[in-house]
UniProtKB/Swiss-Prot annotation:
It comes from Anaeromyxobacter sp. (strain Fw109-5). This is Uridylate kinase. ATP binds at residues 19-22, 62, 66, 169, 175, 178. Its EC number is 2.7.4.22. The lineage of its organism: Bacteria, Pseudomonadati, Myxococcota, Myxococcia, Myxococcales. Inhibited by UTP. One of its GO terms (biological process) is 'de novo' CTP biosynthetic process.
Length: 249
């Protein structure tokens, strides 16, 4: 009789970094955190953990405060960015709570030290948590102003030796144009890093893309609003758009 272990699908990746936007936590709201959406995201993460995948996350803070927007309104850019970093800590703590409620051991590591609520970011400790099966949520971006949480995600993914960076969005990949505004827009199945930069495609900011390109870290852009999509990507299903170093023919 085959064992349950034998029936478990084999994931394509051992260690992943999942990048979530702050807006992903809002659900249908216009601000803040939707408990229902938070629970759904936690469930998707648990599905990956149950497959034996080591999961790290980086979360934005745009559902609470966006540094660039604050700077546009006349606020000092550094101050605005630090406020945005603090917003990511709130989101990280919320997701940690949602994960631990469903039995997933989780640690939050903040690039800005605040010992009462999170561990400081220590690369070796983060890797050790992952090896022990804990989920690690990286908060406060890089800890420096002028750097996006996309860049922080790329940096952390490389530091922990992630196999892939999963960029969660509200659309099912990268398109030639905004599919919500232009019905004729077509989706890319694959893109090279250079194509993303040359065509100025809104995958991630250019610093984040360049970091991934320089270190051969593949990026998969996919729709995270559909329950189970994170698991599908981890199992190697061809959904979304893959950004990488395409082989020349």
């Amino acid at each position: 009789m085959p064992s349950d272990r034998a029936a478990t699908p084999k994931p394509s990746y051992k260690r992943i970094l999942l990048k979530l936007s702050g807006e992903a936590l809002m659900g249908d709201g216009k601000y803040g955190i939707s408990p229902k959406t938070l629970s759904a995201i936690a469930g998707d993460v648990k599905d990956c953990v149950d497959l034996g995948v080591e999961v790290a996350l980086t979360i934005g803070g745009g559902n609470i405060f966006r540094g660039v927007s604050g700077a546009t309104e006349g606020m000092d850019r550094s101050s605005a960015d630090y406020m945005g970093m603090l917003a990511t800590v709130i989101n990280a703590m919320a997701l940690q709570d949602a994960l631990e409620k469903i039995g997933v051991n989780t640690r939050v590591q903040s690039a800005i030290e605040m010992h009462q609520v999170a561990e400081p970011y220590i690369r070796r400790r983060a890797i050790r948590h992952l090896e022990k099966g804990r989920v690690v949520i990286f908060a406060a971006g890089t800890g420096n102003p002028y750097f996006t949480t996309d860049t922080a995600a790329s940096l952390r993914a490389m530091e922990i030796h992630a196999d892939v960076l999963l960029k969660a969005t509200k659309v099912d990949g990268v398109y030639t144009d905004d599919p919500k505004k232009n019905p004729a827009a077509t989706k890319f199945k694959q893109l090279s890093y250079i194509d993303v930069l040359k065509k100025n495609l809104k995958v991630m900011d250019s610093t984040a893309i360049s970091l991934c390109m320089d270190n051969d870290l593949p990026i998969i852009v996919f729709d995270s609003t559909l329950r189970g999509n994170v698991r599908r990507v981890v199992l190697g299903e061809q959904i979304g758009t893959t950004v990488g170093r395409l082989e020349e023919k």
